[in-house]
Structure formats: structure tokens, C-alpha cells
């Protein structure tokens, strides 16, 4: 019988406190010089949480505020669903929906004020950003220019639902979220080159590995790896470790051109729930601490074109929201959202056509 090697599963315990330390409002206050300008709305009202958790997406229609997402649909032969409506009306049960203008008007106004102050923003809750729901906006990013885009993005995200319902899943000291306060973070929008985002694994105050976050091939990254590692070493040992209460964590950073500064994007728990990207968690957990405090970790990069990666867009498994999969959305809401989506795409196409004509 031939010998066969087996890989031992290495347990990586994580506590509730470690997860809480990775909440944006906690760690961002420790490193204000290394994060983008943002507004944090703390202790969100229960009605807002219910609004995010309810079936369907109810957008506010304000009299003095125009939004393309709430403009009345003009019926024509392409969107006349009268044959559907009679049957559906009899089968639909009345459910009291949470509405922004009625149930949390103060928060709604704070969101509008934040947009006026910061311009476009990218939202996130305590831990997660709705990166899986960018399909719902015409620009296919998390860039929100108006309050209805915030509502659409947050409502359509499974990552946001994870924060609301399973924030402490897998914690050794319990997963109960009772009494947990939620925050909404609005970060001023900036265009980031995904090739220059990196994930850094820190175990027992030592860097044990780093990887690019975007899993596509960029031919210029390898020759810059020493520059990237110098900046990563500096921010981990001189900035983060002296103030962060835990010695094991996963740090997301951004290093923009001309590669003389580094910014903190996020801090995540050192746990299997955090995506290990180009590493495996067993691989990370098995890395021994450096000898003589001299760290010689690997910055792992994609070294060749991965055509399969291009064929499978990131977060594509989430590009149909759970509400639609379960057919639990209000049918009328689905029809209206579909029509508005068509109108937005048509408007975007006209604007692009106008821009191209003006350039010629």
C-alpha cells in the first residue's frame, strides 16, 4: 500500500472581541491619517435595520427631490402588465412595509446631508461593504450619488445581511447578536486601482504573507514587490500594531502611484471567514514565526493570465439577490425596478453617445 500524505486541519479560533475590534468605527478612529474622509452614523435605528431585512426594496418618493429611481413609469405596449395584475392582486397579502420618510426620517435626512458634504460615497456597515450588489447600479460600482442608490445597494447585498444576522458566526464564545449596535459608514468616493490593493496576514505580531486582492494578472506588479513590501512592513509595525488590541488580524491596504504612501482599506479577523485569496488558511496557519525577528514573508501575486478568472466576475454568485431567488419580492416592485433599470441604461447610453459626439 503506497504511502499517502494527509494535511492536518488547523483550527483558527476567533472571539467576539476580535470581530468587534474589526468594526470600522472602532479601528478607523485609531488611524485617522490612513483612511479616506468618512462619516459614521452610529447606533442605527431598529426601523432602518428592519428596512434592510424586509422583502423588497421600498424607495422614498419626495415631493421636492427628483430621483430617476422613483420617476413614474409611463405605460406603453412594452411595459403593460395588465394581464398579470388581476390574478396577482387577489393573491398578494398586505404586509406593512418600512418606509424611510415615515419610519426613519431623521436618518434619511442625515444620509442626504452626508451626500451633500462628501459628494459621492461608498457605503458599508460595521464590517462589510455591499461589493456583491454593485450589479444593481448602472455604474456597476459602489459609488452612490444619491440616497436612493444607497438604499438599493444596501438592500440588495448578502454581505450586509451577514453583518445584520451572522456577524459573530463561528466565534468560540458564542454567535448571539442580541444587543449589537450597527453603524453605517459613508466613505468619500475615490477611484481605486484594484491592482494596487493588497491583503496582509498578521499572526502573533508578525507578517506571515500578503497577496494582491484582485485576482487578475498585472505585468508590472512583480518588479514593484520590494517597494510594496517596504510600505506594508512600515504600516504594520509602525502604525497598526502599536495601537491595535489584537496581534493577529488581516489588513487590507491600498498603495496608489507614485508608491510613496499607503492607506488602510479594512481590518478583518484572522479567521477562516476572511477570504485568504491566493493562499489557503491551512497554509497561513502553518507558517512558523520568523527567526531573529527578521521577516521574510511572501507577497503572492498572480503570475500569469487567468482566463477563468475573467470568465467568472468577482461576486457573480451574488448577482441575483436572495429576494429574487426565493421569489419573495412584491411582483409590482420587480416590474417597476426592471422598467426603471431599462430607462437608466437607455439614459446612460444617450449620455455616452452625446459625449462621444462632442469629442469628435
UniProtKB/Swiss-Prot annotation:
ATP binds at residues 124, 127, 129, 131, 187, 189-190, 197, 199, 213, 252, 266, 268. Disulfide bonds: none annotated. ATP-dependent protein-folding chaperone for the eIF2 complex. Binds to the gamma subunit of the eIF2 complex which allows the subunit to assemble with the alpha and beta subunits. Interacts with the eIF2 complex gamma subunit GCD11 (via C-terminus); the interaction is direct and appears to be specific for an unassembled form of GCD11. Interacts with the eIF2 complex alpha subunit SUI2; the interaction is direct. Interacts with the eIF2 beta complex subunit SUI3. Interacts with DMA1. Interacts with DMA2. GO terms for cellular component: cytoplasm. PANTHER family: CELL DIVISION CYCLE PROTEIN 123 HOMOLOG, D123 PROTEIN. GO terms for molecular function: ATP binding; magnesium ion binding; protein folding chaperone. GO terms for biological process: eukaryotic translation initiation factor 2 complex assembly. This is Translation initiation factor eIF2 assembly protein. Mg(2+) binds at residues 266, 268. Induction: Expressed during exponential growth and repressed in stationary phase (at protein level). Levels not affected by the presence of mating pheromone (at protein level). Coiled coil: none annotated. Keywords: ATP-binding, Chaperone, Cytoplasm, Magnesium, Metal-binding, Nucleotide-binding. InterPro entries: CDC123. It is found in: Cytoplasm. It holds the Pfam family D123. It comes from the Eukaryota. It comes from Saccharomyces cerevisiae (strain YJM789) (Baker's yeast). Belongs to the CDC123 family.
